[in-house]
Protein backbone atom coordinates (compact mmCIF):
# COMPACT_ATOMS: atom_id res chain seq x y z
CA UNK A 1 0.00 0.00 0.00
CA UNK A 2 1.18 3.55 -0.72
CA UNK A 3 1.52 6.19 1.98
CA UNK A 4 2.56 9.85 2.16
CA UNK A 5 4.20 11.51 5.16
CA UNK A 6 4.41 15.29 5.57
CA UNK A 7 6.88 17.07 7.83
CA UNK A 8 7.50 20.27 9.77
CA UNK A 9 10.97 20.70 8.24
CA UNK A 10 13.12 19.52 5.33
CA UNK A 11 15.49 18.00 7.89
CA UNK A 12 12.61 15.86 9.20
CA UNK A 13 11.90 14.53 5.71
CA UNK A 14 15.55 13.64 5.14
CA UNK A 15 15.78 12.04 8.56
CA UNK A 16 12.67 9.94 7.86
CA UNK A 17 14.25 8.62 4.68
CA UNK A 18 17.52 7.85 6.46
CA UNK A 19 15.93 6.33 9.59
CA UNK A 20 12.76 4.78 8.15
CA UNK A 21 10.38 2.95 10.49
CA UNK A 22 10.34 -0.84 10.29
CA UNK A 23 8.39 -2.15 7.29
CA UNK A 24 8.74 1.06 5.24
CA UNK A 25 10.26 0.64 1.76
CA UNK A 26 10.72 2.57 -1.51
CA UNK A 27 10.88 6.03 0.09
CA UNK A 28 10.86 8.96 -2.34
CA UNK A 29 11.11 12.58 -1.22
CA UNK A 30 8.96 14.91 -3.31
CA UNK A 31 6.98 18.15 -3.13
CA UNK A 32 3.81 18.00 -1.03
CA UNK A 33 0.62 17.66 -3.04
CA UNK A 34 -1.70 20.65 -2.79
CA UNK A 35 -4.48 18.79 -1.02
CA UNK A 36 -2.03 17.83 1.77
CA UNK A 37 -0.75 21.07 3.25
CA UNK A 38 2.63 20.99 4.95
CA UNK A 39 4.88 23.40 6.78
CA UNK A 40 8.01 22.58 4.81
CA UNK A 41 6.76 21.61 1.35
CA UNK A 42 8.56 18.24 1.28
CA UNK A 43 6.82 14.90 1.66
CA UNK A 44 7.88 11.26 1.61
CA UNK A 45 6.01 8.77 -0.52
CA UNK A 46 6.58 5.18 0.58
CA UNK A 47 5.30 1.60 0.53
CA UNK A 48 4.27 -0.44 3.58
CA UNK A 49 1.82 -3.22 4.35
CA UNK A 50 -1.89 -2.50 4.78
CA UNK A 51 -1.47 -3.25 8.48
CA UNK A 52 1.15 -0.47 8.84
CA UNK A 53 0.63 1.63 11.96
CA UNK A 54 2.55 4.57 13.34
CA UNK A 55 1.79 5.67 16.87
CA UNK A 56 4.72 7.74 18.11
CA UNK A 57 7.13 10.17 16.47
CA UNK A 58 10.17 10.43 18.72
CA UNK A 59 11.68 13.06 16.41
CA UNK A 60 8.57 15.31 16.52
CA UNK A 61 9.19 16.10 12.83
CA UNK A 62 6.26 14.26 11.22
CA UNK A 63 3.16 16.38 10.64
CA UNK A 64 0.98 13.53 9.36
CA UNK A 65 0.99 10.18 7.56
CA UNK A 66 -1.83 9.28 5.19
CA UNK A 67 -2.68 6.14 3.25
CA UNK A 68 -3.55 6.67 -0.40
CA UNK A 69 -7.02 5.21 -1.04
CA UNK A 70 -9.33 5.11 -4.06
CA UNK A 71 -11.38 7.94 -2.56
CA UNK A 72 -8.45 10.12 -1.53
CA UNK A 73 -6.53 9.85 1.73
CA UNK A 74 -7.00 8.15 5.09
CA UNK A 75 -5.10 9.64 8.04
CA UNK A 76 -2.89 7.02 9.73
CA UNK A 77 -1.02 9.39 12.06
CA UNK A 78 -1.47 13.04 12.95
CA UNK A 79 0.94 14.95 15.16
CA UNK A 80 -0.51 16.16 18.45
CA UNK A 81 1.30 19.46 17.69
CA UNK A 82 -0.66 20.04 14.47
Predicted segments with their positions:
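A short beta-strand micro-motif
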Residues: 4-6
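C-terminal structural segments of small proteins and small subunits
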Residues: 48-82
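Amphipathic, hydrophobic secondary-structure cores in small proteins
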Residues: 1, 26-47
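Short amphipathic alpha-helix segments
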Residues: 10-26
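Helix N-cap motif at beta-to-alpha junctions
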Residues: 9-12, 45-51
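A generic structural signal for short, non-catalytic loop/turn and secondary-structure boundary residues
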Residues: 22, 37, 58-61
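Short acidic, gly/pro-rich beta-turn/loop elements at beta-sheet edges
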Residues: 15, 39, 54
Amino acid sequence: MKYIATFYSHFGAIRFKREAPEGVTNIELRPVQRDLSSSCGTSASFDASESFTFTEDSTEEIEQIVAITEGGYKIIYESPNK
